[in-house]
């Protein structure tokens, strides 16, 4: 046994459980924890971000890229509240994150007083965190720390992953506790076994089956296993936005992502499939539309495989069968069974028809933004990490990016927080140690622009692509549809919106920065895109809108902008309508 401070114990706990990097912002109530991080700097690194929100998003990116625990450390009061948005992001996107914030001395806490506040920068943090975490902890005694940290770590990873919160007073941080000479890693609970054979038989028996794949597959570390399963089943794959990077662009089984901001191809397939096997997706209304009867109207069976049975409280279709299972068991079981009966069924005519339809549709609904992201991602190496923001820049990215082997895309999917891509790129780059590409718009870029300093001072290999149309383009789409195109607070002409010179701003932070006016100009910067130093590219262009903008569930052939007659006729012929 040995004696060490609580702060030292917490840092050793992180090290024992494989955490290599933590993110945060120094403050009075966490000075002891930061001091301990400095003492252990040869075994763990701390990254001081430009704000607590930036640190929280960076921790999300780190956790998504590595599968490890993402740790955020902030001071009390405003430090904690600044990080709440990142905590909410982790909650909705099932990201394994732990937020630790300092708190005033236990003797200065409000306790049972009816006062608004007793200690300086005190806030009722636990009560505020509870709705957006799996569990919140209050370490008011030394004995809370050891058992509490163990339980918090298990809680993050058991079942559906998600964040936890720990509130720790400053006097507890510096107290001494006795512990074992060597801390051991927490063992994670293995998944319950499941037999997937019956569901695979049903898929093979269908005429037009598809797999609907979501971000949960990546969260479970099953990307390679999923690709193996697809190669065995040989059926089309439609993805959600978080699952968009699961299947390479050149795969014969890739259809594309679904939803109101998607291209039409996925909608056409969904409208005509007779069987859906949904893996790793909660099937949100953003994906399937708000009128569930319009979603997969011809399907005779929907099998939803979901680890969180509360998601089944929202029944989507009369034909659905709900399967509570961990994909870590379901996908290996499906692979094992598919290997035994390989060749017994042939859905290649269906696959070929889908590919022919995709080819016929490939030149439709293209904007400058689509062309830009298609060309930009074509220049990137395999295994590229791409972080996305919120707005039309995200739409262009998921619609038109070239997904190569190993490409990963990270976004704020459930919360949909602007300002995500740049700080998330910090965490992804730190965790993956390879060049990371942050795609953002002029609106989102300014939300967490301070993280350019984090990137610059650490010389992180982050390349930022700013799509500067001097407008909030995604909101303009809404204003066109519902508000007679009154562009209030979305353009400079509409009033109270202003963009800036991002290339000049990047240079001010010490980052190589370039203005791009033509897509082809990117070609001369291929070496910059692939080197290990930060860079910023600002592309100025006129707002080009978003196509086709069809609400989820509606027939994509008869809704949205009218398709050319030759394309419509070709699709109808190919799909046999």
Predicted stretch roles:
Residues 7-20, 25-38, 351-433, 575:
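Active-site diphosphate/adenylate-binding microenvironment
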Residues 53, 168, 307, 388-390, ...:
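Generic detector of well-ordered alpha-helical packing
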Residues 1-2, 143, 299-392, 519-523, ...:
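Phosphate/pyrophosphate-binding active-site segments
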Residues 1-338, 379, 462-464:
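N-terminal alpha/beta PP-like core and its mobile active-site loop of ThDP/TPP-dependent enzymes
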Residues 132, 274, 375-384, 506-511:
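A structural motif corresponding to the C-terminal end of an alpha-helix
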Residues 100, 110-120, 315, 324, ...:
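Thiamine diphosphate
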């Amino acid at each position: 046994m040995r004696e060490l401070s609580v702060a030292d114990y917490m840092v050793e706990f992180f090290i024992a459980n494989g955490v290599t990097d933590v993110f945060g912002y120094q403050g009075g109530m966490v000075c002891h924890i930061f001091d301990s991080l400095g003492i252990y700097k040869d075994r763990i690194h701390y990254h001081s971000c430009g704000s607590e929100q930036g640190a929280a998003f960076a921790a999300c990116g780190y956790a998504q890229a590595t599968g490890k625990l993402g740790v955020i450390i902030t001071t009390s009061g405003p430090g904690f509240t600044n990080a709440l948005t990142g905590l909410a992001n982790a909650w909705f996107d099932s990201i394994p994150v732990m937020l630790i914030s300092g708190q005033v001395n236990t003797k200065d806490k409000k306790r049972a007083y009816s006062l608004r506040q007793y200690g300086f920068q005190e806030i009722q943090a636990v009560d505020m965190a509870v709705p957006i975490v799996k569990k919140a902890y209050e370490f008011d005694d030394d004995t809370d720390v050891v058992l509490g940290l163990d339980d918090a770590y298990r809680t993050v990873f058991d079942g559906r992953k998600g964040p936890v919160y720990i509130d720790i007073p400053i006097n507890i941080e510096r107290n001494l506790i006795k512990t074992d000479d060597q801390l051991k890693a927490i063992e994670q609970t293995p998944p319950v076994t499941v037999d997937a054979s019956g569901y695979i038989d049903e898929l093979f028996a269908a005429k037009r089956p598809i797999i609907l794949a979501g971000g949960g597959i990546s969260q479970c570390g099953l990307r390679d296993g999923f690709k193996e399963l697809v190669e065995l089943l040989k059926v089309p794959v439609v993805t959600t936005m978080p699952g968009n990077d699961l299947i390479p662009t050149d795969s014969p089984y890739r259809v594309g992502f679904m939803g109101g901001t998607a291209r039409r191809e996925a909608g056409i397939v969904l409208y005509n499939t007779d069987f859906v096997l949904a893996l790793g997706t909660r099937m949100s209304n953003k994906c399937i539309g708000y009128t569930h009867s319009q979603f997969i109207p011809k399907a005779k069976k929907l099998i939803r495989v979901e680890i969180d049975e509360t998601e089944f409280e929202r029944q989507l279709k009369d034909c659905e069968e709900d399967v509570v299972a961990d994909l870590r068991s379901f996908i290996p079981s499906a692979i094992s069974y598919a290997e035994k009966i390989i060749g017994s069924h042939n859905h290649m005519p269906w696959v070929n028809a889908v590919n022919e339809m995709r080819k016929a549709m490939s030149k439709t609904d293209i904007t400058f933004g689509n062309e830009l992201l298609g060309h930009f991602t074509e220049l990137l190496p395999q295994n590229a990490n791409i972080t996305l923001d919120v707005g039309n820049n995200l739409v262009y990215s998921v619609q038109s990016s070239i997904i190569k082997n190993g490409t990963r895309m990270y976004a704020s999917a459930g919360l949909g927080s602007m300002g995500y891509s740049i700080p998330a790129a910090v965490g992804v780059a730190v965790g993956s140690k390879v060049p990371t590409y942050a795609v953002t718009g002029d609106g989102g870029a300014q939300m967490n622009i301070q993280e350019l300093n984090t990137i610059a001072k650490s010389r992180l290999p982050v390349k930022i692509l700013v799509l500067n149309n001097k407008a909030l383009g995604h909101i303009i789409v809404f204003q066109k549809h519902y508000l007679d195109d009154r562009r209030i607070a979305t353009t400079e002409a509409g009033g109270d919106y202003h963009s800036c010179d991002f290339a000049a701003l990047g240079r001010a932070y010490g980052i190589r920065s370039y203005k791009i006016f033509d897509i082809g100009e990117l070609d001369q910067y291929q070496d910059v895109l692939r080197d290990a130093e930060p860079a910023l590219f600002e592309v100025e262009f006129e707002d080009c809108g978003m196509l086709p903008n069809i609400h989820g569930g509606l027939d994509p052939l008869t809704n949205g902008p009218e398709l050319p007659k030759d394309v419509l006729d070709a699709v109808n012929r190919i799909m046999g309508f």
